[in-house]
Curated annotation (Swiss-Prot):
Domain of life according to the entry: Eukaryota
A GO molecular-function descriptor: signaling receptor binding
Main subcellular location of this protein, as a coarse class: cytoplasm
Signal peptide range in chain numbering: none
Modified residue annotations for Phosphotyrosine: 388
Entry keyword set: ATP-binding, Cytoplasm, Kinase, Lipoprotein, Nucleotide-binding, Nucleus, Phosphoprotein, SH2 domain, SH3 domain, Transferase, Tumor suppressor, Tyrosine-protein kinase
Annotated positions binding ATP: 241-249, 263
Native species: Rattus norvegicus
Localization terms from the record: Cytoplasm; Nucleus
Name the UniProt record assigns to this protein: Tyrosine-protein kinase FRK
Length: 506
């Protein structure tokens, strides 16, 4: 029971306020990514170090490079701080020495968060994925907060294509150790020592793991924090990415600087007032596995919805185009785990998606998957044989919708769990249509007979059992997304193990 509580705390901690860490016409909010901004002291002149490169999006922004030193002057704008660059001749900075910066791109100077090897509260599976990027070599390493032991840390090291993990334990009197015969006052001392000798590790520490997953700023710029409706002339449509019954999706450019995705909606596909009411809620939802809404243009047709750009399109297309040639079970489970992570956040916010499906999950660089279009099902107007229209004018994609939602028009996070089970079917079958050959009416009839999709031929029993849990006829008996996330994170390692330093001591 204790371990469950610790895992629950480790899961919830990232969603608590970040006390532990952490032009232009335009838009709204964006996703904070995997890094939470530090708490800045309101006093003038606090010093910070840049964790990532940032190129100014507006004339008021400040460009900088990873490792640059910055003096923060004002933190009154949420997500955007006024800062001064302390290195006057930084490459590519020109004459701009003061401006606004995204707060989740910096950490307080000389803090643990500022160290290139510290990755914060990422999970074991994510540590492995990042270390296994081809850009990293043997000896690449990172230190992260322990998932199971609050206040402790874990060391993850790449050794000839295999990631090994070590518990960094604390001394009662302060300090850290792997083995008690060698202790350290600080983590910096720990890292400095093991970069000179392996001494119990599988390999000597070399370069820190590259931080390839760059967080997304909270908004397009500091001026757009409180703006919602933007001038459509600030948006350029560059390349059509796809089309559907609601309209088209384009790759676009905001303010001649920032790549975005733009949904252009067919006239009459939604009521602008209904959408804006829903959008006020949607824009406040921030999580690394959710597509964050940036802005809208609703004053004339076509309505524009501006979001973060995910260059590989929908998960449905991604799966269908691959057809199993490269994607294997490990990546399929990772897809499902990332979606479950985003949905667990919506669950924690008491928010319901209503249209969870592979077509509404987007694929980015480095195998990143994010949930999109949450909440939009309430405002779209559709006419399709596979859509169930209730007497209350709620439209349902029948093949993804829970029986009780079809029957009573009552949605809950548990009806989203049912849809997640259908999404798992799409993932494991490389994007096949569920209930292939059946009409929406036939599906409704079969569900009434307690029919469930059969186990696909290439689907492991363990994966199918998770699907079946999602399709429990009793909504209350379906797992939470929090539980689904844990199950998928631990799919290949139900008993997480750490390497023993004694195995490597000569």
């Amino acid at each position: 029971m204790g371990s469950v509580c610790m895992r629950l705390w480790a899961y919830l901690q990232p969603f608590l306020p970040c006390w532990s860490q952490e032009a232009d016409k335009s838009v709204v909010i964006e996703n904070p990514g995997a890094y939470c901004p530090p708490e800045a002291n309101r006093s003038q002149g606090q010093y910070f170090v840049a964790l990532f490169d940032y190129e100014a999006r507006t004339a008021e922004d400040l460009s900088f490079h990873a490792g640059d030193k910055l003096q923060v002057l004002d933190t009154s704008h949420e997500g955007w701080w006024l800062a001064r660059h302390l290195e006057k001749k930084g490459p590519g900075l020109g004459q701009q020495l003061q401006g606004y910066i995204p707060s989740n791109y910096v950490a307080e100077d000389r803090s643990l968060q500022a160290e290139p090897w510290f990755f914060g509260a990422i999970k074991r599976a994510d540590a492995e994925k990042q270390l296994l990027y081809s850009e990293n070599q043997t000896g690449a390493f990172l230190i992260r907060e322990s998932e199971s032991q609050k206040g402790d840390f874990s060391l993850s090291v790449l050794d000839e294509g295999v990631v090994k993990h070590y518990r960094i334990r604390r001394l009662d009197e302060g300090g850290f150790f792997l083995t008690r015969r060698k202790t350290f006052s600080t983590l910096n001392e720990f890292v400095n020592y093991y970069t000179t000798t392996s001494d119990g590790l599988c390999v000597k520490l070399e370069k820190p793991c590259l931080k390839i997953q760059v967080p997304t700023p909270f908004d397009l710029s500091y001026k757009t924090v409180d703006q919602w409706e933007i001038d459509r002339n600030s948006i350029q449509l560059l390349k059509r990415l796809g089309s559907g019954q609601f309209g088209e999706v384009w790759e676009g450019l905001w303010n001649n600087t920032t790549p975005v995705a733009v949904k252009t909606l067919k006239p009459g596909s939604m009521d602008p007032n209904d959408f804006l009411r829903e959008a006020q809620i949607m824009k406040s939802l921030r999580h690394p596995k959710l597509i964050q809404l940036y802005a809208v243009c609703t004053l004339e047709d076509p309505i524009y919805i501006i979001t973060e750009l995910m260059r590989h399109g929908s998960l449905q297309e991604y799966l269908q185009n691959d057809g199993g040639s490269k994607i294997r079970l490990t990546q399929q489970v990772d897809m499902a785990a990332q979606v479950a992570s985003g949905m667990a956040y919506l669950e924690s916010q008491n928010y319901i998606h209503r249209d969870l499906a592979a077509r509404n999950v987007l694929v980015g660089e480095h195998n990143i998957y994010k949930v999109a279009d949450f909440g939009l099902a309430r405002v779209f107007k559709v006419d399709n044989e596979d859509i169930y229209e209730s007497k209350h004018e709620i439209k349902l994609p029948v093949k993804w919708t829970a029986p009780e939602a079809i029957r009573t028009n009552k949605f809950s996070i548990k009806s989203d769990v049912w849809s997640f089970g259908i999404l798992l079917y799409e993932i494991i079958t490389y994007g096949k249509m569920p209930y292939s050959g059946m009409t929406g009416a036939q599906v409704i009839h079969m569900l009434g007979q307690n029919y469930r999709l059969p186990q696909p031929s290439n689907c492991p029993e363990q994966f199918y059992s998770i699907m079946m849990e999602c399709w429990n006829v009793e909504p209350k008996q379906r797992p939470t997304f929090e539980t689904l996330h844990w199950k998928l994170e631990d799919y290949f390692e139900p008993d997480s193990s750490y390497s023993d330093t004694n195995n490597f001591i000569n």
